[in-house]
Amino acid sequence: MGMISEKDRYLLLSDLCARLPYGLKCEVLCVKETLNADFIKHIINDKTFQIKPYLRPMSSLTYDEVCHLCYLQKLVGEVTRYNVEDFDTEGEVSVVLTYIGADGTPHEVFHYLIAPCKKTSLEVWDWLNENFLDFRGLIARGLALEAPKKMYKEKK
């Protein structure tokens, strides 16, 4: 991994700190570990300290998870199909949904942007962190590893 830019280091540190309470798995100096506060201290004090979290790509969202995300964002209607379209490093997640509205009217495509400015977003960001989803684009930047499918147990 070597030296990373200050911007990437800050992005990684922000992500790791937000996930600290949830049992995030990481590769630390090539060994799989569960994230703890000692690793955070190393990252702050040593710019060459190598740690990569295992995160789920946004494309791994399940139907039930998308439904829950819609519930958290106070969206009405039953989701019948979905596709995670895109996400960027600023924390915005674009989700394209085909759904049946509360009035029973089918809507072919509903494009929804989950963005930090939404008043319900704190719940959403906590949920995304708790479910180890890579909404910051760390995998694409080489700052995180894609988690194997069953690394994190499904929450009931």
Functional labels for PLM-detected ranges:
Residues 1-156:
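Structural boundary micro-motifs
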